């Protein structure tokens, strides 16, 4: 399962919970205009992979390091089919068998973020970077945890470090903006405009930045949502992204109005 997809599904849930304090009228305005997708069919391949890893874990011929890797892989698959409790059990088993497996701490940190146990989440992401300082997604994940944990200044630092590793990634640009907007909305807008210069205008994700910059209206943004879509899976992911960022932009603008 793609890490970006897992992260997006995770933070969408957190954002929706947080947006309940925002004007219902504003939120409904955006959501009502989002196109609907066809429900995705279950991914039976993942279920088959889970069964295969379960059989391998019963083998007496594998050592603890190999078991840890298998628990990590099966845990990720459990996450992909929505079995988060089983995923956490496997991740914890992997840590017990191989305490220096950085990726496991990364996923545990995500789970702690989802349960809003931010202190534990920070510890997990710190552990990732102690074991592997080049693990770039730990900067993203810790930045997201800090963002939802109410520490936007520290969040900005992590997300800027994540952006520096790929300045042409619109999603990274967006997360830097979201964190900076919590500190200084006007400065964040100017930085978003500057960071957008490195983006490819032909990438759909760039339209997210254009939406936030006011270069696209919401109607124009939604009208182009199907362009270049290769299949139902990609369409579902794009709808999820559109919903997520539309809710956030309404929340940001609402907060700016309140502050004024």
Residue ranges: model-predicted function:
Residues 64-68, 102-103, 136-137, 169-171, ...:
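Helix-start (N-cap) detector for alpha-helical repeat units in TPR-like alpha-solenoids
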Residues 53-54, 91, 125, 159:
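Hydrophobic/aromatic packing residues within the alpha-helices of TPR/SEL1-like helical repeat arrays
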């Amino acid at each position: 399962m793609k890490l970006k997809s897992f992260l997006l599904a995770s933070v969408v849930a957190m954002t929706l919970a947080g947006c309940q304090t925002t004007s219902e009228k504003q939120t409904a305005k955006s959501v009502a205009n989002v196109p609907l997708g066809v429900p995705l069919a279950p991914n039976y391949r993942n279920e088959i992979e889970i069964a295969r890893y379960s059989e391998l874990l019963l083998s007496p011929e594998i050592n603890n390091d190999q078991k840890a890797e298998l628990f990590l892989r099966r845990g990720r698959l459990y996450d992909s089919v929505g079995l988060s409790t089983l995923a956490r059990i496997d991740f914890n088993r992997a840590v017990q068998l191989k305490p220096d497996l950085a990726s496991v701490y990364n996923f545990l940190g995500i789970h702690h973020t989802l349960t809003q146990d931010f202190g534990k989440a920070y510890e997990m992401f710190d552990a990732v970077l102690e074991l592997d300082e080049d693990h770039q997604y730990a900067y993203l994940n810790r930045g997201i945890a800090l963002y939802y944990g109410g520490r936007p200044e520290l969040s900005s630092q992590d997300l800027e470090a994540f952006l520096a590793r790929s300045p042409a990634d619109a999603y990274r640009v967006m997360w830097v903006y979201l964190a900076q907007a919590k500190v200084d909305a006007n400065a964040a807008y100017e930085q978003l405009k500057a960071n957008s210069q490195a983006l490819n205008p032909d990438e759909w994700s760039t339209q997210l930045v254009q939406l936030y910059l006011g270069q696209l209206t919401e109607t124009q943004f939604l009208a182009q949502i199907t362009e270049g879509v290769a299949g139902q899976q990609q369409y579902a992911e794009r709808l999820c992204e559109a919903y997520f960022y539309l809710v956030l932009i309404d929340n940001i603008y609402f907060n700016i109005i309140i502050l004024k």
